[in-house]
Amino acid sequence: MTGRLCLAGALIGVAGGLVTAFIEPAVGPDRYSYPYTPTGLVLAELTFILNHLLLLIGVLGLARSGAAGQGWLGRVGLWTSMVALVALTLCEVATIALADSAQPTPRTDTLGMAYGVASILIGVGLVLAGIAVARTRLWTGWARHIVLTSGIAVFVIVIPGVFSTFLAGRLVLVIWMLMFAALGLALIRSPHPATTR
């Protein structure tokens, strides 16, 4: 079940990223809701919140699968990822409160830093958990490396992409969501336990 929910969450993220990337802007880039109207941003944020919660379920499923083993590396990585995903979800909630705001402002800058910290911690957590998964060898083939790949991607493509153009930032997030979709598939095919499917 957690695998299917993670896959669904990732696909929601893919759809949201593509819509945000290619929708006709309704406001100028000086508005925090860009490219959406304030109401549109609220609706988008609700889907992003759902996306993050479903990905959180996926990471919880990874923890329950035993694929990361019982060592400290896997435990620290998984807990770091889960706490950071909760923090990222709270950032999305805070964004709703700024839907009518101009940008940049001290509040939008602070929220931007919070997004950055949460994203970095997700990356760190996934790298640690991914190393543990690779060492444990419960998963085989591409699944053995997908968690580590997802963590490394935060630093290699996500962060550089977000600091590039608006379009590039959205597209790298779509790529990252596809990696979470692969995690969902890995959980579905995982032999232990049945609840990960």
Language-model features, listed with the residues they occupy:
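Hydrophobic, aromatic-enriched alpha-helical segments typical of multi-pass transmembrane helices
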Residues: 1-197
